[in-house]
Amino acid sequence: MPIRPPLKELNIKTEDKGFYKGFNRFVTVTSKVLVTLVVIWILSDIERSGVILNSMKNWSYANLNSYYTYAVAFYVLVCLTVILWPSFGRTKLGDPNGKPEFSNFSWFSMIFGAGIGIGVLTYSAAEPIWHLANNPDTIMAKEMILTALSASGTPLPEGADVFAFYQDQIAANTLVPIEGVVIPKTEGALDAAFRYSFLHWGISAWATYCLVGICLSFFCYARGLPLTMRSALTPLFGKHLEGALGNIIDISAVIATIFGISQTIGIGLGTFASGLYSITGISWLVTNPINPEPTTGALLLSLFVVMCLSIGSALSGVGRGIKWLSNINMILSFLLLAFFLIFGATMFALEMLGKGIFSYVVNLPAMVVTVWDPNTELGAWQTSWSIFYWAWWIAFAPFVGIFLARISKNRTIREFGLIGIIAPSLTLFVWFSFIGGTGIDLELSGIAGGKIFDSGLTAQLFEIIGLMLDSTMANIMSAMVVILLLTYLVTSADSALLVVNTVNSAGKDKVENGAKHLIIWGVALTAVIAALLLAGGLDAITSAMIIAAIPFSFIIILMAISLLKALIMDS
């Protein structure tokens, strides 16, 4: 039986006149209507909608933790396979003699800025600190202690801290030390603190992004198909993608992008507002000065500023506003990192970097497929951290994937993968080791006195800076962080708006009324984030993001199968 030649033409219907000229009317209008309905539903009953979103999130955590875990493991396996398999990796994503549009520095800057730029400023300081206090190793240690106490007939006093009581029993020689017990907030918990931070921000995240990006680049530049999500499924569904099936796939990508970027911007807005409070001390920016959390008013004002700048940047295009902003925030990022390299806990951070990478690599195969019962304490930890991240990266993948494809023409699959996965992962490991490591060192040495542990997620970076410097220098450094956050927020939002326009216009870079649609989507994204903030703050945004990620997670699985089929047939 002869092998069918690959499909190299996909006729996606677009309008030839009017406001939607150049756009697929069904995808564009349906996406706008769905987003509008979500906003109306939330605003019609803010309290009730917040409760419903939270219930749906909890259902997803309870029933889809295994699915999310194995789906991401599958993405990693497929992505590494196509990169490392000799004939696959040599495949050129474009003209065999063509040269990349952007320099390696600009390309990497845009990858990093759009991919996880905002989150790293918040979580590089916060996540190692949080894991030092609570992680699977300490949870299993607690279970071991409780089992030992039960076996020895020693009752745990009501309300007593398990670890403090255990250490008291050891000191009193009434209990034999248990091998393998990891005590929270001690040096024994360092390995897990960095191992799990690297798990969440390393290969799993970037392989998910790059898998989508490679799929789209291959089918767009090597096969000549439109740069839109449905094109990546042509080996499976062929011409059927020209109709309703393809429309559904593209709509799913738009919805996932809107809610995925909402999560990222929401986190960034919280840190941005915390930074403004750290610099100015304006009371209305936070709920209370003892444990400052950004107020809804501060978040909404920050959102308005960010989205106005983002729409302006998006209108200037990838080659101008986004490129230059990406270069600026990369330079500022490395200035911030240099500050921690020079003034932070350098030797401690280097030790954590080396040990953390070793522990991460050794344990990665087991960590990516481990699933705990969501009804246990271990399962609760996994859903609130790992499953949250997997859903976030999946919801973010259509945006980052299309954006990566737009800037990666004429690179090979291996070049795309090696730079797109390894370079950002290693960069993030350095960030977490030096910024989070400095915070941990301040706590373990007693200098911080629990201040970093007690700070909110979005305030911990500024707390670390405040402990390292006098008030004047701390304000200057905090101001630089706030500016850096603003550039990351604008870069991420404007890139997302361009991606949404790309999907709606059947992969076209420029369409006649593109600027008007960019403005509409900018307003729509602002309305979604504002409505979710009113409905329950960052928790409501997280709930919506996790729900939006579910359908697109299945589409990525199909894209992976489609890419493998195409590469095998070509070879």
Regions found by a protein language model. Name each.
Residues 2-173, 315, 338, 549, ...:
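N-terminal alpha-helical transmembrane segments of multi-pass membrane transport
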Residues 15-20, 45-61, 82-99, 193-200, ...:
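Membrane-water interface regions at transmembrane-helix termini and the short interhelical loops
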Residues 19-43, 76-78, 116-120, 151-159, ...:
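Helix-loop-helix module between adjacent transmembrane segments
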Residues 20-30, 89-109, 347, 351, ...:
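C-terminal membrane-solvent junction of multi-pass transporters and transport-like membrane proteins
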Residues 34, 67-84, 333-344, 427-437, ...:
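Hydrophobic alpha-helical segments of multi-pass membrane transport proteins
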Residues 51, 55-59, 132, 142-201, ...:
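Interfacial loop/helix-cap signal at membrane boundaries in integral membrane proteins
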